Curated annotation (Swiss-Prot):
Required for maturation of 30S ribosomal subunits. Its main location: cytoplasm. The keyword Cytoplasm applies. The gene is rimP. SUPFAM superfamilies: YhbC-like, C-terminal domain (SSF74942), YhbC-like, N-terminal domain (SSF75420). This is Ribosome maturation factor RimP. CDD domains: YlxS_C. It comes from Oceanobacillus iheyensis (strain DSM 14371 / CIP 107618 / JCM 11309 / KCTC 3954 / HTE831).
C-alpha cells in the first residue's frame, strides 16, 4: 500500500512541480503512532520558501481529493528537505561534489559501514570521499550500489 501511495503521489505532484520549476526530493508515506503522514519534500536552486510549499500543498491536496487513493485518514505535509538533504538519486551526488556528506552502507568497506567527509567525485558508479581519522585524511571509494542512505552533512 505504501509504495502504491508514493508512486501515485509522485505522478500527481510531478506536473505541479514542473510548472513551478521545483524539484521533487522525496516522498514518504509513513505511520507514526496511530496517524498516517504523506510527506512530500521539494526544493529548488537557492532553497524553497513556505509560500511555495503552501501552494504545492494546496494543489496536490486537490489532486489527491479527486483521485482519492488513500483510504485511511492522513496528514499531508509539503516541505523543504532541510539542510541535511537526503541524496536519493545519482544526480544528487553529482550536484553535491565538494560538499560534506554522510553515507551509510549495506555492508562495511575497510571495516566501517558509515562515512562522513567531503564528496570528491562521482562517476555514476563510484562515490569517492575524503574523510578524517583523527588528524589524517583518508580516501574511500564506495560503490553506489552499496549505499543504503546518504545525506548532506552539516558541520559547525
Amino acid at each position: 500500500m505504501s509504495s502504491h501511495v508514493v508512486s501515485l503521489t509522485e505522478e500527481l505532484v510531478t506536473p505541479i512541480l514542473e510548472e513551478k520549476n521545483l524539484e521533487l526530493v522525496d516522498i514518504e508515506y509513513v505511520k507514526e503512532g496511530k496517524n498516517w503522514f504523506l510527506r512530500v519534500y521539494i526544493d529548488k536552486e537557492g532553497g524553497i520558501d513556505i509560500m511555495e510549499c503552501g501552494e504545492v500543498s494546496e494543489l496536490l491536496s486537490e489532486k489527491l481529493d479527486e483521485s482519492d487513493p488513500i483510504t485511511e485518514a492522513y496528514f499531508l505535509e509539503v516541505s523543504s528537505p532541510g539542510v541535511e538533504r537526503p541524496l536519493k538519486k545519482k544526480e544528487d551526488f553529482d550536484a553535491s561534489i565538494g560538499k560534506n556528506i554522510f553515507v551509510k552502507l549495506y555492508e562495511p568497506i575497510d571495516g566501517s559501514k558509515e562515512y562522513e567527509g567531503t564528496l570528491q567525485s562521482f562517476d555514476g558508479e563510484t562515490v569517492t570521499m575524503e574523510y578524517k581519522v583523527k588528524t589524517r585524511k583518508k580516501q574511500v571509494e564506495i560503490p553506489y550500489s552499496k549505499i543504503a542512505k546518504a545525506r548532506i552533512a552539516v558541520t559547525f
